[in-house]
């Protein structure tokens, strides 16, 4: 394959192909615990089936880098684990752009400088990346999202609005009727859908940070920004049953930081 050829050209000491049924397979990965580079050439983790990884990178303590040929989402579960483990990584978008450059050179019979690959990759990465806003209830996430979207010519999305549209009642009503735990499940479902989008500004509910799984859902295609406002400047009440008083907000802020 292309990946094997490139690795051999780069003087890799050895290249092992893992398959489902071959001699080297997913049931005996421990044979290769000394692997220094892993390249995912499968579609595992690709949109719309995000959130799954072909291997657990923690099984490879000597890893120095990983590459995923998948480019949507920008950060697959495979890449997100590498990021958490501090392992250098690259997703498939750069490879896609490089392939397009070479195709254009062949069809147009001209040379295109390598700097164009870098320029287009950076441009596409920025355009496709979501801007995700998190913060305390009443910190202005929805307002800031709308203004950012207008300024940057992007679509503004809101996880609370998504929940309300899907369930036919307000977030406050859902919490009062079903309790906070069930509401958080609905919130994660909404975030899972929004996190697969690209090029949007996403405002999240104040409590989305209480569930660790939401981080990966939002970060797979986005940069996460925290709107940090003093507790005394936050809006109290306003249809938010969990932040009905300043004392409740202060306690919430202490728990969520």
Roles of regions detected by a PLM:
Residues 9-26, 160-167:
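NAD(P)-binding Rossmann-fold cofactor-contacting core
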Residues 133:
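Hydrophobic anchor at the beta1->P-loop junction of P-loop NTPases
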Residues 220-257:
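A glycine- and Lys/Arg-enriched "phosphate-lid" helix/loop adjacent to the NTP-binding pocket
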Residues 70-129:
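Adenosine-phosphate binding glycine-rich loop
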Residues 141:
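Conserved lysine of the Walker
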Residues 158-219, 250:
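ATP-dependent small-molecule kinase phosphotransfer cores
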Residues 22-89, 208-215:
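Rossmann-like adenosine-cofactor binding region
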């Amino acid at each position: 394959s292309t990946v094997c050829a490139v690795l051999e050209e780069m003087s890799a000491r050895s290249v092992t192909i893992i398959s489902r049924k071959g001699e080297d397979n997913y049931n005996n990965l421990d044979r290769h615990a000394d692997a220094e580079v892993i390249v995912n050439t499968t579609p595992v983790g690709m949109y719309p089936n995000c959130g799954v990884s072909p291997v657990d990178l923690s099984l490879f303590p000597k890893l120095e880098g990983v590459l995923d040929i998948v480019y949507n989402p920008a950060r697959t579960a495979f890449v997100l684990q590498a990021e958490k483990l501090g392992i250098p990584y690259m997703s498939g978008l750069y490879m896609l752009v490089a392939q397009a450059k070479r195709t254009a050179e062949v069809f147009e019979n001209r040379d295109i400088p390598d700097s164009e690959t870098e320029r287009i990759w950076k441009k596409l990465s920025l355009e496709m990346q979501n801007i995700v806003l998190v913060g305390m209830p009443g910190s202005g996430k929805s307002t800031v999202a709308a203004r950012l979207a207008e300024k940057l010519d992007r679509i503004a999305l809101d996880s609370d609005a998504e929940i309300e549209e899907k369930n036919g009642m307000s977030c406050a009503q859902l919490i009062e009727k079903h309790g906070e735990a069930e509401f958080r499940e609905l919130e994660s479902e909404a975030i899972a859908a929004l996190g697969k989008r690209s090029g949007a500004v996403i405002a999240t509910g104040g409590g989305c940070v209480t569930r660790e799984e939401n981080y990966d859902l939002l970060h797979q295609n986005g940069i996460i920004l925290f709107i940090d406002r003093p507790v005394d400047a936050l809006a109290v009440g306003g249809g938010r049953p969990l932040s009905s008083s300043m004392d409740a907000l202060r306690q919430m802020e202490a728990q969520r930081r």
